[in-house]
Amino acid sequence: MDSIKLEFNTPKLKKLRTIYIVEDNAMERNMLIDFLGNYPELKIKEFSTGDDCIKDIIVSKISPDLVLLDYFLDSNNPLSKDGLEVLTKLKEVSPNSEFIMFTSVDNERIVELARKKGAMAFIVKGAAGYELLDSIIRNNFSREAF
């Protein structure tokens, strides 16, 4: 793929308050948390596996406004679900949440599957990816929500 990122549709996220990060790589997860620190009003929750995120939503009965989801989630357990499998289950347990695939994968088939499964955007990690993520959050961030 020639592009660094592919954006699907980015509807306005009403009252963006809570972002969940599903990323198995601790360094990548911490980079996202640091990046999102630019928005101190947001509540950030992190998960190293998709199953942990799914369980948290089911048990707490609280759905995030936005989930940032990696594709490869198997660095700690090779049997872990991949990001597309997690996206499918998250859409079931949290249908009002929005989902962004934020990953190092740059594969057109996976991009298309993510779109079909309901991801609002597919962003390839890197400087341009963080710029796009910042733009999406900034353009959809409603300070009146607080």
Predicted regions located by residue number:
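Two-component/phosphorelay signaling modules centered on CheY-like receiver
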Residues: 26-51
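Short amphipathic alpha-helix used as the core "switch/output" element in two-component signaling
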Residues: 78-96
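Non-catalytic signal-transmission and effector/linker regions of two-component phosphorelay proteins
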Residues: 1-20, 25-31, 130-146
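Acidic, metal-coordinating helix/loop segments flanking the phosphotransfer/catalytic sites
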Residues: 46-66, 70, 74-75
